[in-house]
Amino acid sequence: MALECDSTIVFPRPLTRLVKCDLELRNTAPYPIGFKVKTTAPKQYCVRPNGGRIEANSAVSVEVILQPLDHEPAPGTKCRDKFLVQSTELKPELQGMDIADIWTQVSKANISERKIRCVYSEGPSTANAHANAHHQPAQTTTTSIPTSATDNYTTVNGNVNQSYSKGIDGTALPSTHANPVAAPSTATTQHTQLPKTSAVSHQKPHEAPSTAVKAPTATVAENEPYPKPQSVPTTTSPNNENNALRSTANVINNTRQSTATSPSMFAGNSGNQIGLARVSSSFGRPTSGAKVVPQIHNTVTVQTAFLLAIICFLIGLLF
């Protein structure tokens, strides 16, 4: 196949720190190829770049980073981690596509694979022994040949975990490989619960509805006449009508006599009204002790008006 690489990766001790190794990928074909790197332990390793393009008859150096282990493995411990490098030819129809998107457009028969084993160094002699095997060509397989049933490869992350950013100086840092699913810390729990508490504390209390009652105000339209008092219909008997007529005639006679005897009663003396009792009321109702003058027939009213006109004329002649 076009892609060639080493069959093993040796990680020098101590392994409780961040360990970096270089892996060289070579393209021996006269055409460009695309590659991507997978591993059986994606949470333990970081590969930069984890995929890309290799031009014809050229090579690319890939950096493999081992996250710090929580404890140093015993001598002779066998590492079960593996890497899988997949490659395919970049045909003209795939030239403009992203490397991460070309794998869905390529058939499995056109994808070649190379497996790489991970080894923990045990000393200078062991490291030299592995260094000799480091340059041996890796086993070449294709997707048509099934791989081991126990191997489950996943694309490697291209970024180092932030919790191990200070492990390059050799300081031992805890590893997440032994326990990938870690329980959230107390600070994280408090942080997640903080918005609920703050939301309750800063929530404004509901304002109580106002119980004030506005006093009703009476508005009177301009030039609006005051309401007239409603007259209550009364039923009168024939005797009452006769008595009313008699009293009306008496009032007229008294008015004539008083006009003839004292004509000066109309000369501004408001206290002597034409023999009629005062009637004062705020709503048209007679006060106590007042005499109610019954209604006079229209003819009598006309006669009275005529007499009053004559009296006024005579008074005018006197003055």
Curated annotation (Swiss-Prot):
Modified residues (Phosphoserine): 237, 281
Recorded topology in the membrane: Single-pass type IV membrane protein
Transmembrane segments: 299-319
Bias-annotated ranges (Polar residues): 151-165, 185-201, 231-244
Gene3D superfamilies in alphabetical order: Immunoglobulins
S-S bridge residues: none
PROSITE patterns hit by this protein: MSP
Keywords: Endoplasmic reticulum, Membrane, Phosphoprotein, Transmembrane, Transmembrane helix
Disruption phenotype: Leads to the dissociation of the cortical endoplasmic reticulum (ER) from the cell periphery and its accumulation in the cytoplasm, in particular in the vicinity of cell tips; when scs2 is also deleted. Affects contractile ring assembly, contractile ring anchoring and displays severe cytokinetic defects; when scs2 is also deleted.
Cytoplasmic side: 1-298
Primary localisation category: endoplasmic reticulum
Modified residues (Phosphothreonine): 236
Gene Ontology CC, one term: cortical endoplasmic reticulum membrane
Region (Disordered): 127-244
InterPro entries, per database record: Ig-like_fold, MSP_dom, PapD-like_sf, VAP
Entry remark concerning the domains of this protein: The MSP domain is required for binding to the FFAT motif of target proteins.
Homology family: Belongs to the VAMP-associated protein (VAP) (TC 9.B.17) family.
PANTHER family, A to Z: AT11025P-RELATED (PTHR10809:SF6), VESICLE-ASSOCIATED MEMBRANE PROTEIN-ASSOCIATED PROTEIN (PTHR10809)
Protein name: Vesicle-associated membrane protein-associated protein scs22
Organism of this sequence: Schizosaccharomyces pombe (strain 972 / ATCC 24843) (Fission yeast)
